Regions:
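N-terminal secretory/targeting leader peptides
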Residues: 2-119, 127-223
């Protein structure tokens, strides 16, 4: 099973300019909370690159201080942190927010959904951004594309999986609607942030997990 094109979203508070950012002599500093361990290749470094690009595009007038998971808020609470003004920006994945609205899942990895190119085309040219804006408006937020991992791999397991019968009762780390799909096969979905996955596998708290793919997984110790 493959999941398609995880779009990492930069969530921006629509009232961010009024959320008490640090201001000095016409310069502003915003806070960006993320769901990723500090310096994590791909996802974490992507957030840092986004922050650097924003500073460059603003001519240095706006700087972004990037917070890794847990530094300012827990990894899976970026959405709420931006909504309540703790931070002006967040960098994470939409399927972490399905507790706020099931529609959030459609703006990140979705089982048997868009390819990377299809997702980008839908957001930019197929009214996807309009729907995203409408979905986040009640929370005072706006979502934007901020990168893509491409097609993702299925998982890592503590024991060999030979058939569907081996999935029965398997505690498997996966967020979003992919967890619902696997639940139909007898899997028990568990939501965990990236930094907690490997320790949970080591301890036996979970039986399997998915993250992204070879490049990103290697950084978390999956190989």
């Amino acid at each position: 099973m493959k999941r398609r094109s995880l779009l990492k979203a930069a969530v921006l508070g629509s009232g961010a300019a009024f959320a008490a950012p640090a201001i000095s002599k016409g310069l502003m500093e915003w806070r960006m909370v993320t769901s990723w361990p500090k310096g994590l290749p791909g996802l974490g470094t992507g957030a840092e690159r986004l922050a650097a690009n924003i500073t460059a595009m603003s001519g240095g007038r706006l700087t972004i201080k990037v917070y890794a998971a847990g530094e300012l808020v827990p990894a899976l609470e970026c959405f709420g942190a931006v909504a309540n003004g703790t931070a002006q920006m967040g960098h994470d994945a939409g399927y972490y927010h399905t507790g706020k609205s099931e529609g959030c899942a459609f703006f990140t990895a979705f089982p048997f959904g868009f390819t990377m190119g299809e997702m980008a085309a839908w957001i930019k040219h197929g009214n996807g951004q309009k729907l995203w804006d409408e979905l986040y408006a009640p929370f005072g937020l706006r979502g934007f594309q901020a990168g893509s991992t491409g097609t993702q791999m299925f998982g890592w397991f503590r024991r060999e999986i030979r058939g569907l019968a081996d999935l029965q009762g398997l505690k498997f780390r996966t967020p979003g609607n992919q967890g619902r799909v696997l639940q139909k096969l007898g899997v028990i979905p568990v939501s965990l942030p990236g930094g907690e996955i490997f320790p949970a596998l080591q301890s036996g708290a979970i039986d399997g997990a998915e993250w992204v793919g070879p490049y990103n997984d290697l950084a978390l110790g999956f190989y």
